[in-house]
Structures are given as structure tokens and as C-alpha cells.
């Protein structure tokens, strides 16, 4: 069975192995054991309530119970930019006009921005390539919304997600080559790694404080502004079906888009509801679990011992029938409450 749970210290080796499969461009999961260990500790301290909001970050793992192995991760930062500045480019417009010359021209620009300061961030989503099947990807991504819905008081009014921008097969970023290289004089992979391991002071020190004219960039760079890496396209689609949208903000390194939404308007947050657990052995004649039913995310409401699974079911009343195996995976007993939401919007066919 596949289940999502909070990260534990014993997961470090598996997460380090996962980090080696991410490739260039995933700044929040560098293959650095010391950094990953610190990230795990920060998550544990977040659950213990010992950190300020600007330091808090939840880290979840997708575990294959049969193999006893972590095969994916996803995370939520509670409030970005409160300790270290949060940078991106806002894609804007400057108008150059002259009545005397009868000239009026709109020029696209990139403005260095801290506009998302204080927002909650969905981040660090990565799934082992061998497990990119059976709806594991949407499960790992959207389960964060059930956690947010259950513990809404901990999160901002807005949620954002930075999408990995385009890089070629050699790990080269056209956007970086046309923008970042001129200011940093280092390779994209190096800047990416420094940012991912928390060494971000160089961004504030070296990034331009004045708007950049998009027309001055190479055509190859202009073409990838707001575009995602091919491997990230499914993750973007998952979030867009939940209501997150691109609003003209891009990553300062690779030009990838930032998606955003009002937290309470996210479909899985808004539509999630509670059900009372009934535990029964499997009987197809009187049991709600049905391979032809709708896929649902199901999670307990235990803050420190959060658990979530994916199941097929037909909802007929305020109860949710679980097998003993599913109840054990969730850490719930008969009469407990669970939170549930369909994996996809009802009108979305999958």
C-alpha cells in the first residue's frame, strides 16, 4: 500500500537517493546529505511548534509499505521570505511614447520582485520515476491540500508553487544564459545548487535592481519565460486543475512560472469534508470500496501523526467504510473522523 506521512529521521538515506535522481533545476532537493538532514530536522521542529513562521516547513514522504521504502517527497513552506528575501521576476510592461514622433510602443520587462513575501509555498515535489504510475503523482501533490484544510490556521491566505523551468538535455538553461550569467558569472548548475542549499546572499548582492527589457534577451530565452521543464508539465497540470494559475511571476534563475491561488479557493481545500470511519472486512456486496468507484484522497486529522492514502470508493452517506488494512495505514479506529476529497474534480475525467 502507498501512504503519505510526515518525514522521519530514518528516511534520510532514501531521500538522499531520491535527490540523486532529480537532475538540474530542482533547487529544494539538492543531493547534499547535510542539507537534507537539516531539512528533516526543520520539519520535525515545525511539527513540534518550536520555530517561527518564517522558518516553518512541513515535509511529507510517500512510502511503499510493502517495500518499506520512501519513493517520493512533497513539502509546504508556511511563510516564505520572512527571514531571507524571496525573489522572483514579475513580467511587466513599460510604455515608451512620443506624440512628436507618433511613436507608441509597449515593451515587456522583468522586474525583480518580493511580492510573494509571507505566502505559503508548495514545494519539493519529487516522485521516483519507477513510481510515476497509478496516480501516485497527483496523490503526492494534492495530499498537501488535505493537510492545509485540516490545519488551516497555520497557513497563509495565499498559496504559491514555483515550477521548474526549461533546461535542455545537458542541463543548460536558455534563460540563465541570457540573464543570470551576465550578473553572476557562474554556471547555472552552481547557482542552482547554492540557492538550494540556502546560500542565497549572492542573489541580493548581484541581481539587477532595475527592470530588464525582455526584447534584449536572446530569442531562445524569451521563448522559455513562464514555461516548465517537460518533466514538470504533469505537476503543473495537477495544480492548475486545483485552481492555481500563472499570474506573471517567474523564477530568477530558469524563468519557470510561479502558480498561485487564494488558499480557500483551492478545490481540494474547499471541497474536502469529514466522514466517520466504519471498519469492515472486504465484501463487494455491501462494501463501499469499488475498483470502479471514484478515486479519493483520505487522511486522518492527527497533526503529529498525519497519514493519507488513496482509495476507490462510492460515497453514500456520512460514513466511510475502510478495510482493516486501510484503517491501520491511516492510524484510525471505528468512530474516528477522516478527511476526504476526490482526487480529481467531478467534471475531470481520468
From Swiss-Prot:
Q: Which residues bind succinyl-CoA?
A: 125
In terms of Gene3D superfamilies, this protein maps to: 2.40.40.20
Q: Which UniProt keywords apply?
A: Acyltransferase, Arginine metabolism, Transferase
EC number of the protein = 2.3.1.109
Q: Where would one find the signal peptide in this protein?
A: none
GO process annotations (BP):
arginine catabolic process to glutamate; arginine catabolic process to succinate
Organism domain of life = Bacteria
Reactions catalysed, as given in the entry:
succinyl-CoA + L-arginine = N(2)-succinyl-L-arginine + CoA + H(+)
Question: InterPro entries, per this entry?
Answer: Acyl_CoA_acyltransferase (IPR016181), Arg_succinylTrfase_AstA/AruG (IPR007041), Arginine_N-succinylTrfase (IPR017650)
Query: Which molecular function GO terms apply here?
Result: arginine N-succinyltransferase activity
Pathway involvement?
Amino-acid degradation; L-arginine degradation via AST pathway; L-glutamate and succinate from L-arginine: step 1/5
What the entry lists under Pfam families is as follows: AstA (PF04958)
Active-site residues annotated for this sequence: 229 (proton donor)
Family note? Belongs to the arginine N-succinyltransferase family.
Biological role stated in the UniProt entry:
Catalyzes the transfer of succinyl-CoA to arginine to produce N(2)-succinylarginine.
Question: Which HAMAP family does the protein's record reference?
Answer: AstA (MF_01171)
What PANTHER family does this protein map onto? ARGININE N-SUCCINYLTRANSFERASE, N-SUCCINYLARGININE DIHYDROLASE
- Protein name, UniProt field: Arginine N-succinyltransferase
Amino acid at each position: 500500500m502507498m501512504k503519505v506521512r510526515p518525514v522521519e529521521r530514518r528516511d534520510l538515506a532514501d531521500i538522499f537517493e531520491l535527490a540523486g535522481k532529480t537532475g538540474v533545476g530542482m533547487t529544494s532537493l539538492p543531493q547534499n546529505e547535510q542539507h537534507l538532514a537539516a531539512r528533516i530536522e526543520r520539519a520535525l521542529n515545525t511539527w513540534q511548534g518550536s520555530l517561527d513562521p518564517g522558518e516553518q516547513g512541513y515535509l511529507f514522504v510517500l512510502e511503499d509499505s510493502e517495500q518499506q521504502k520512501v519513493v517520493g517527497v512533497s513539502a509546504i513552506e508556511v511563510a516564505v521570505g520572512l527571514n531571507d528575501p524571496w525573489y522572483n521576476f514579475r513580467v511587466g510592461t513599460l510604455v515608451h511614447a512620443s506624440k512628436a514622433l507618433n511613436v507608441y510602443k509597449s515593451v515587456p520587462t522583468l522586474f525583480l520582485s518580493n511580492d510573494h513575501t509571507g505566502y505559503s509555498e508548495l514545494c519539493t515535489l519529487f516522485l521516483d520515476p519507477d513510481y510515476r504510475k497509478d496516480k501516485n503523482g497527483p496523490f503526492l501533490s494534492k495530499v498537501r491540500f488535505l493537510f492545509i484544510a485540516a490545519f488551516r490556521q497555520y497557513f497563509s491566505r495565499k498559496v504559491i508553487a514555483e515550477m521548474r523551468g526549461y533546461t535542455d538535455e545537458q542541463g543548460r538553461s536558455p534563460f540563465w544564459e541570457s540573464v543570470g550569467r551576465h550578473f553572476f558569472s557562474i554556471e547555472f548548475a552552481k547557482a542552482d545548487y547554492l540557492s538550494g542549499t540556502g546560500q542565497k546572499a549572492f542573489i541580493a548582492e548581484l541581481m539587477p535592481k532595475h527592470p530588464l527589457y525582455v526584447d534584449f534577451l536572446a530569442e531562445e530565452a524569451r521563448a522559455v519565460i513562464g514555461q516548465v521543464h517537460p518533466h514538470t508539465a504533469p505537476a503543473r497540470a495537477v495544480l492548475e486543475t486545483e485552481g492555481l494559475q500563472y499570474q506573471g511571476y517567474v523564477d530568477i534563475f530558469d524563468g519557470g512560472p510561479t502558480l498561485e491561488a487564494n488558499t480557500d479557493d483551492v478545490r481540494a481545500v474547499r471541497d474536502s469534508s469529514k466522514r466517520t470511519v466504519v471498519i469492515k472486512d472486504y465484501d463487494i456486496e455491501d462494501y463501499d470500496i469499488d475498483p470502479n468507484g471514484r478515486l479519493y484522497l483520505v487522511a486522518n486529522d492527527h497533526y503529529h501523526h498525519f497519514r493519507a492514502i488513496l482509495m476507490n470508493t462510492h460515497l453514500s452517506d456520512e460514513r466511510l467504510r475502510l478495510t482493516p488494512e486501510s484503517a491501520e495505514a491511516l492510524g484510525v479506529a471505528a468512530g474516528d473522523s477522516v478527511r476526504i476529497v476526490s482526487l480529481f474534480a467531478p467534471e475531470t475525467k481520468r
